[in-house]
Amino acid sequence: MKVLVLGAGVAGVSSAWYLAEAGHEVTVIDRAEGVAMETSFANAGQLSYGYTTPWAAPGIPTKALKWLFKSHPPLLFRPDGSLYQIEWLWQMLQNCTAAHYQTNKERMVRISEYSREMFRRFEAQTGMNFEERKKGTLQIFRQTKEVEAAEQDIAVLERYGVPYRRLKPEECAEFEPALARVTAKIASGLHLPADATGDCRLFTENLYKLCQEKGVRFHFNQTISRIDHNGLRIKTVETETGRFEADAVVCALGCFSRTVLAQLDLNLPIYPVKGYSLTLPVTNSDGAPVSTVLDESYKVAITRFDNRIRVGGMAELSGYEIKLPEKRRETLALVVNDLFPEGGDLSQASFWSGLRPMTPDSTPLIGRTRFDNLFLNTGHGTLGWTMSLGSAKLTADIVSGKDTEIRSDDLSLSRYQA
């Protein structure tokens, strides 16, 4: 079949790869100048297969209210003037029950663990370099009350068989030697040995080249203006400069999936949750992180690439704007300087923001729509990198009419239409 993929971030390019592997004739279009230019550009770099957790959880509403009054809040809410922002928040609050949390957690772990397996197969097949490190994630807690609050998440790790180890402050330095200098600031730690790290943008750029070798065609600077259909099937996708026909269409447009597909009267429950990152050069390897350190107090991740440190996190609900407030930069700089003061050069750091496509239940939208030939692979929130290959393989199998290797029927848009 001729398959048109909308979006050239990690979700779209990964989908193109598996569709081409399945023998389809694949075309990818994107409004940007190249691949991985938006949400995939400078994310935190974590491949967090083990600590895949819904935002919507019991106790989150209370926590969110407290965070709003912190000097460096991990969550920030700014009214964007739309009724939809309120509707989305209400849907998220409805998912903050124990029952919904367990259902959503199971779905997310299922996709993430499958994605881990897809990464294993992919690396064996291609040997691609994307500065991957398989040295786990270290979550640090600065206060005892944070440890107590995390007990529910730790119980879920136990239930799903995700390997972990509780650590005393001094034991954290076994995995991150540079933290030996600051153990007095740590109450305890949690190590997830099966997690990994990697540069999402580098991965997507290299995968783009592999896709081209398989015959996938890419068209950039293509802003979608119209989608023509007959009520049952998509006929053409029109941009400002071209017209694309296909037997099947895959939407992997992240936050913009909702706005682009609104013309089809499809109501995708996706809201743009803004995140920030700093990227700085390593100046002292002994003083830098080895893998990823997740600071529970600030909800900030510090990740090591080969010669760079990526500091990313926070969540801001403020619509589609991507301004770079100095206050957010200060938060990221504070955390990395507090834990790894000798690791990198903040004066040379680049500051970035991106929009995460979040659903109210934190689970992506994967699979069919009411249009026979329109499929979704979007809405991954903060886990688009982690879930990328697993979601893409599921999407390619569904488009191809194959049975998926894991359950996928509860991942489609229909769960919001029941």
Swiss-Prot record:
Pfam families from the UniProt entry: DAO
Binding-site list for FAD: 3-17
Catalytic reaction list: a D-alpha-amino acid + A + H2O = a 2-oxocarboxylate + AH2 + NH4(+)
Cellular component aspect of the GO annotation: cytoplasm; plasma membrane
Annotated pathway: Amino-acid degradation; D-alanine degradation; NH(3) and pyruvate from D-alanine: step 1/1
Function, as annotated: Oxidative deamination of D-amino acids.
The protein's name: D-amino acid dehydrogenase
Gene field: dadA
